[in-house]
Swiss-Prot record:
UniProt binding sites for Zn(2+) 1: C44, H67, C154
Listed PROSITE patterns: ADH_ZINC (PS00059)
Bound cofactor: record note: Binds 2 Zn(2+) ions per subunit.
Reactions performed catalytically: a primary alcohol + NAD(+) = an aldehyde + NADH + H(+); a secondary alcohol + NAD(+) = a ketone + NADH + H(+)
Entry's family note: Belongs to the zinc-containing alcohol dehydrogenase family.
Full protein name: Alcohol dehydrogenase 1
InterPro entries: ADH-like_C, ADH-like_N, ADH_Zn_CS, GroES-like_sf, NAD(P)-bd_dom_sf, PKS_ER
Molecular function as annotated in GO: alcohol dehydrogenase (NAD+) activity; zinc ion binding
Positions that bind Zn(2+) 2: C98, C101, C104, C112
Domain of life, source organism: Eukaryota
């Protein structure tokens, strides 16, 4: 297919500035890169932070955000092997890494000190054509819907890796704090598919309904419960074996240590601005509780997360909007009005 010189994309020139839906140049792939015709992109809370500039990590400017892009390979650099024109490919948060440092050698590529990040340090998937390092680009099976698979590329991989990091077994209880947003709605399904019992913590009747529809076992509305810790203890017959914190509430993170059982694990995923993780040292030591951070996933985690999706074990509850509507999506994110995951169609 003929590749145009210009395309539609959303770009901003300063943090918090206007999100401009406009014609921008189509990027040229470097020798190690793919050029992907992005059909759909999920919208992640990280994209909001990149625009606001409120993380202690510098972005490039101007910037095209987005890091859950699903599309088709239309060109590639001369050093690329193992890919063909027409393959389905995904743009992840980790666009590229050095592949030679200690972290990369240990398959901890997201922790590479030279990591290149889609929609942050590398123009991302809120455009019709985007580049991705051929080594890190996700291989999407041909039998899947590109709109539905888009959120798996970050949200799905992230929660799947977080659940693996909890080191629990089938039949154990996992509590998901922030259960029905874009991350939580996928965490519920991955947890069920991995054989765990799922308790969800969130707010609102709409989210309670979604939690049950996705197969969750017990839902706590934190705005209605009189004693959340006591309710978790009662529901799980002795508190949770693990907690996955995907909320962006500092208070929720600190509270989660209180409803984790002895030798359990608290996994931190959500990144609230300027937050601290506070834990009573005596309680943590005597109960031998582990508090760990989990940051996206490596290539194997991506492959495994996509396999769960392609087998129909997880499905992102998505709403599709046009790329031109991205500013309104950010506004709803700020107000906490997103249920499930928003996916933008780059053709609209």
């Amino acid at each position: 297919m003929a590749i145009p010189e210009t395309q539609k994309g959303v770009i901003f020139y300063e943090h918090g500035g206007e999100l401009q839906y406009k014609d921008i140049p189509v990027p040229k792939p470097k020798p190690n890169e793919l050029l992907i015709n992005v059909k759909y992109s999920g919208v992640c809370h990280t994209d909001l932070h990149a625009w606001q500039g409120d993380w202690p990590l510098d972005t490039k400017l101007p910037l095209v955000g987005g890091h859950e892009g699903a599309g088709i390979v239309v060109a590639m650099g001369e050093n690329v092997t193992g890919w063909e024109i027409g393959d389905y490919a995904g743009i992840k948060w980790l666009n590229g890494s050095c592949m030679s440092c200690e972290e990369c050698e240990l398959s901890n590529e997201p922790n590479c000190p030279k990591a290149d990040l889609s929609g942050y340090t590398h123009d991302g998937s809120f455009q019709q054509y985007a580049t991705a390092d051929a080594v890190q680009a996700a291989r999407i099976p041909k039998n899947v819907d590109l709109a539905e698979v888009a959120p798996i590329l970050c949200a799905g991989v992230t929660v799947y890796k977080a659940l693996k990091s909890a080191h629990i077994k089938a039949g154990d209880w996992v509590a998901i704090s922030g259960a029905c947003g874009g991350l939580g709605s996928l965490a519920i399904q991955y947890a069920k598919a991995m054989g765990y019992r799922v308790l969800g913590i969130d707010a609102g009747d709409e989210k309670a309904k979604l939690f049950k529809e996705l197969g969750g076992e017990y839902f706590i509305d934190f705005t209605k419960t009189k004693d959340m810790v006591a309710e978790v203890i009662e529901a799980t017959n002795g508190v949770a074996h693990a907690v996955i914190n995907v909320s962006v509430s500092e208070a929720a993170i600190s509270t989660s240590v209180l409803y984790t059982r002895s030798n359990g694990t608290v996994v931190l995923v959500g990144l609230p601005r300027d937050a601290q993780c506070k834990s009573d040292v005596f309680n943590q030591v005597v109960k031998s509780i582990s508090i760990v951070g989990s940051y996206v996933g490596n290539r194997a985690d991506t492959r495994e997360a996509l396999d769960f999706f392609s087998r129909g074990l997880v499905k992102a509850p998505i709403k599709i909007l046009g790329l031109s509507e991205l500013a309104s999506v950010y506004d709803k994110m700020v107000k906490g009005q997103i249920v499930g995951r928003i996916v933008v169609d780059t053709s609209k």
